[in-house]
Curated annotation (Swiss-Prot):
Function: Catalyzes nitrite uptake and nitrite export across the cytoplasmic membrane.
Record flagged with keyword Cell membrane: yes
Pfam families documented for this protein: Form_Nir_trans
Annotated protein name in UniProt: Nitrite transporter NirC
Source organism: Salmonella typhimurium (strain LT2 / SGSC1412 / ATCC 700720)
A single BP term in Gene Ontology: formate transport
Location(s) in or outside the cell: Cell inner membrane
Parts of the chain on the Extracellular side: 47-58, 126-153, 196-230
Topological type in the membrane: Multi-pass membrane protein
Family recorded in the similarity comment: Belongs to the FNT transporter (TC 1.A.16) family.
Length: 269
């Protein structure tokens, strides 16, 4: 039932591990690209949201954020939140080791951070119409996120990456227009529901930091948010999606590591 999708995810995990080991610069550049792509989506939705009545703002922002994951998937790049699912399935299928997984994840996160801050800098240098005004929702949302309780951030992070990984999972299982609809619906649900995505928050926080933010907005608050949201994102990617679909697949249908390790299987992803 899920064997083919697990095969593709595990083969992608092997590809990620090879890229990280054999071409570290390429891996970091690709990770930075993912952070930048998500950042472009954040700039888009906050530009639109700043103009809208609060009653319709979540729907419009959610309906337009699909560009972020579409760029990550279709253009190709290395996104931390998606890696939590891919690498977990790679470990279970035997295409990578636990050590490789936990070495790659922080590198991906840091690469995403570099790209997120870079695109925020470009926006700031380009005039950044959202940044000079202290009433901009960039600043109010960033402050609210950095002062939220840890438990709220953790569980919103878990719910968020459940949807993001579902979007990626469904994109793997579908073709054509259905692929884009899967991404669109899941990201609409994530943004409109107010969930927390560590990489999306990176750009938002950088945007606010480079602008006219409140004195209550601090680096400690940013670190607080990113810590708990990252942990929540990791929980859902590893447990809900990676382990969830592995154990939802009958043992007799789970892929054999020897089969997945064939070079042609990795090349097909």
């Amino acid at each position: 039932m899920f064997t083919d999708t697990i095969n593709k995810c595990a083969a992608n995990a092997a590809r990620i591990a090879r890229l990280s080991a054999n071409n570290p610069l390429g891996f970091w550049v690709s990770s930075a690209m993912a952070g930048a792509y998500v950042g472009l989506g954040i700039i888009l939705i906050f530009t639109l949201g700043n103009l809208l009545d609060p009653s319709v703002r979540p729907l419009v922002m959610g309906a337009t954020f699909g560009i972020a994951l579409t760029l990550v998937i279709i253009a190709g790049s290395e996104l931390f939140t998606g890696h939590t699912m891919f690498l977990t399935l790679g470990v279970k299928a035997g295409t990578i080791s636990h050590g490789q997984m936990w070495a790659i994840l922080p590198q991906t996160w840091l690469g995403n951070l570099v790209g997120s801050v870079f695109v925020a800098l470009l926006y700031s240098w380009g005039g950044g119409s959202l940044l000079p005004v202290d009433t901009s929702i960039v600043h109010s949302v960033a402050l609210a996120k950095t002062t939220a309780p840890a438990t709220v951030l953790f569980f919103k992070g878990a719910l968020c990456n459940w949807l993001v990984c579902l979007a990626i999972w469904m994109a793997i299982r579908t073709e054509g227009t259905a692929k884009f609809l899967a991404i669109w619906w899941c990201l609409l649900a994530f943004i409109a529901s107010g969930y927390e995505h560590s990489v999306a928050n990176m750009t938002l926080f950088a945007l606010s930091w480079f602008g006219h933010h409140s004195d209550a907005y601090t680096l400690a608050g940013i670190g607080h948010n990113l810590l708990w949201v990252t942990l929540g994102n990791t929980l859902s990617g590893v447990v809900f999606m990676g382990l969830g679909y592995w154990y939802a697949t009958p043992k007799s249908e789970r892929p054999a590591p020897a089969k997945i390790n064939q070079p042609e299987a990795a090349a097909n992803n």
